[in-house]
Design a protein with these regions (language model features):
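Short glycine/proline-rich turn/loop motifs
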Residues: 27-29, 84-97, 232-241
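Conserved AMP-binding/adenylate-forming
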Residues: 64, 69, 73, 82-105, ...
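Conserved AMP-binding A3 loop
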Residues: 100-103, 251-275
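Cytosolic, low-complexity regulatory segments enriched in Ser/Pro/Gly with interspersed Lys/Arg
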Residues: 1-26, 245
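A short N-terminal helical cap/helix-turn-helix that marks the beginning
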Residues: 3, 11, 37-87, 108, ...
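Structural core segment of the AMP-binding/adenylate-forming
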Residues: 2-12, 46, 147-233
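Conserved pre-ATP/AMP-binding loop-to-beta segment of ANL
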Residues: 58, 219-226, 232-255, 262
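Conserved S/T- and glycine-rich ATP-binding loop of Class I adenylate-forming
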Residues: 128, 145, 176, 250, ...
Length: 275
C-alpha cells in the first residue's frame, strides 16, 4: 500500500497464455514513467537535482577495511559417487565504523575527478571501463562519466582475465578505473587490449605490478598509469564544466558475469536509466 492508502500497483492488462497480467504504479497506470521529474533527461541532470534538493544531507557512507583475517576450513564435496574433503581458505574483513560525507562533498569530488579525466583525454568520443569493487570511488568514477558524457562499461570485479578482456575489447575501451588488488588481473590481458591507454587505480598497489603495466602500455599514444588521488588533484587545478548529453545517448554498457559463457554487454541510454 502507498502512504495515501492506494494499492501500490494496479492491473492494466489481463494475463495471456503462459504470461501473467501486467501491473503498473497507481501513479501512472496509463503509461510507463519516463522520468522522475520534469526537465530531467539524463543521469547528470538527475544527480544535479539531488544535489540541489539534498546537498547538505550526509547520504554517502562507507567503511574502510581495517584488517583481513583468514581461516582454514575443511569442506566436503561430492565428485561422482565419492565424497572428497579439501581445505579452503576463507577470508573475513574487519571494517571501520561508518564514515559519512554530504551529497555536496561527494559531488565536489566528482567535479574534480571528471575534470581530471578530461585532462587525460577521456571524453564523449572514448569509452571507459569500471572494473572495481562497488564503493565510493566506483560511484565517483561512474558519476564523472555521466557528467562528461563518457560511455562507460561496468565489469564485475570477480571477472577473470578472459571476461575482462571481452569487456575491454568489444567496446574498444581506452581508459579503465580499477582497484590495486585487481591490477594483477588487468596485467594478464593488457597486451591483448592495445587500445587501452589510461589506467587509473586506487589503493596501495604492488610496485612490481605497476612497473610491468607501465612497461606494457608505455609505447601507446598518450598512455598514462595514474592513481585515483592524482586524477582528483589534477582535476582540481584544471576544472572543466560538464559536457552536454541527451536522453538518447548511450550512458552505460553493463557486462554480465559470464557465468554461462562470455560476458554480454547490455546497452543502456540515459532514457533507460532515469525511467
Amino acid at each position: 500500500m502507498s502512504k495515501q492508502g492506494h494499492k501500490a500497483s494496479v492491473q492494466v492488462s489481463p494475463g495471456e497464455g503462459a504470461f501473467g497480467p501486467i501491473y503498473r504504479s497507481f501513479l501512472s497506470p496509463e503509461h510507463l514513467v519516463e522520468r522522475p521529474h520534469e526537465g530531467i533527461h539524463t543521469m547528470y541532470e538527475l544527480m544535479e537535482e539531488a544535489r540541489k534538493r539534498f546537498g547538505d544531507k550526509k547520504n554517502i557512507a562507507w567503511r574502510d577495511i581495517v584488517d583481513e583475517h583468514q581461516e582454514q576450513k575443511v569442506v566436503t564435496k561430492k565428485i561422482g559417487d565419492e565424497e572428497v574433503k579439501e581445505t579452503k581458505t576463507w577470508t573475513y574483513y574487519e571494517l571501520s565504523p561508518y564514515k559519512y560525507i554530504t551529497i555536496n562533498e561527494f559531488f565536489k569530488t566528482v567535479d574534480e575527478f571528471a575534470s581530471g579525466m578530461h585532462q587525460l583525454g577521456l571524453n564523449q568520443k572514448t569509452v571507459f571501463n569500471i572494473f572495481a569493487s562497488t564503493n565510493v570511488s566506483w560511484q565517483v568514477a561512474a558519476q564523472s562519466c555521466f557528467r562528461q558524457g563518457i560511455t562507460f562499461c561496468t565489469s564485475y570485479d570477480t571477472l577473470g582475465p578472459e571476461g575482462l578482456q571481452v569487456s575491454l575489447e568489444e567496446p574498444e575501451v581506452q581508459g579503465i578505473f580499477t582497484n590495486a588488488q585487481h591490477l594483477k588481473v588487468l596485467e594478464k590481458i593488457i597486451d591483448q587490449t592495445p587500445l587501452l591507454r589510461v589506467v587509473i587505480y586506487d589503493g596501495e598497489a604492488d610496485e612490481n605490478i605497476l612497473n610491468r603495466i607501465h612497461s606494457k602500455i608505455s609505447g601507446r599514444p598518450n598512455a598514462v598509469l595514474i592513481h585515483y588521488d592524482e586524477v582528483i588533484r589534477n582535476g582540481k587545478q584544471n576544472m572543466v564544466g560538464p559536457a552536454p548529453t541527451q536522453g538518447k545517448d548511450v550512458a552505460c554498457i553493463m557486462y554480465t558475469s559470464g557465468s554461462t559463457g562470455k560476458p554480454k554487454g547490455v546497452i543502456l541510454t540515459n532514457d533507460n536509466l532515469i525511467a
